[in-house]
Amino acid sequence: MESTAKLSFARLSPRKTRLVVDMVRGKGIQNALNTLRFSPQPSAKLVSKLLSSAVANAEQKGVADVDRLYVKTIYVDGGTVLKRFVPRAMGRASKIRKPTSHICVVLAEKK
């Protein structure tokens, strides 16, 4: 049985978030959470919360053994980019791009 969790419009760069997501793909839940706990990346905290949410979803569905869950698929898609402007000298303006990410996690039981 599979359980999913999604996080939309996270104010994180998709490129930087993919580095964190690649560390936990295919690992068991406890191993993945420990890996994220000691990662210095800011996106690791949100990904660990998302994994915990997916585990809670699995418990609600009635998965027999939560300890047998592993990260089947996890991926990051780019969301909308918030565009802002900063005033510069001589009446100019510079563009600031604030990227967002959509993260999706699918957990499954080991056979």
Curated annotation (Swiss-Prot):
The record's listing under Pfam families reads: Ribosomal_L22 (PF00237)
Q: Which InterPro entries does this one have?
A: Ribosomal_uL22 (IPR001063), Ribosomal_uL22_bac/chlpt-type (IPR005727), Ribosomal_uL22_bac/org-type (IPR047867), Ribosomal_uL22_CS (IPR018260), Ribosomal_uL22_sf (IPR036394)
An example GO BP is:
translation
A single MF term (Gene Ontology): structural constituent of ribosome
- An example Gene Ontology CC term for this record: cytosolic large ribosomal subunit
UniProt keywords, alphabetically: Ribonucleoprotein, Ribosomal protein, RNA-binding, rRNA-binding
Q: Which domain of life is it from?
A: Bacteria
Keyword Cytoplasm among record annotations = no
Which family does the similarity line name? Belongs to the universal ribosomal protein uL22 family.
Cite the record's note on assembly. Answer: Part of the 50S ribosomal subunit.
Q: What does this protein do?
A: This protein binds specifically to 23S rRNA; its binding is stimulated by other ribosomal proteins, e.g. L4, L17, and L20. It is important during the early stages of 50S assembly. It makes multiple contacts with different domains of the 23S rRNA in the assembled 50S subunit and ribosome. The globular domain of the protein is located near the polypeptide exit tunnel on the outside of the subunit, while an extended beta-hairpin is found that lines the wall of the exit tunnel in the center of the 70S ribosome.
Q: What is this protein called?
A: Large ribosomal subunit protein uL22
Q: What is the lineage of its organism?
A: Bacteria, Pseudomonadati, Thermodesulfobacteriota, Desulfuromonadia, Geobacterales
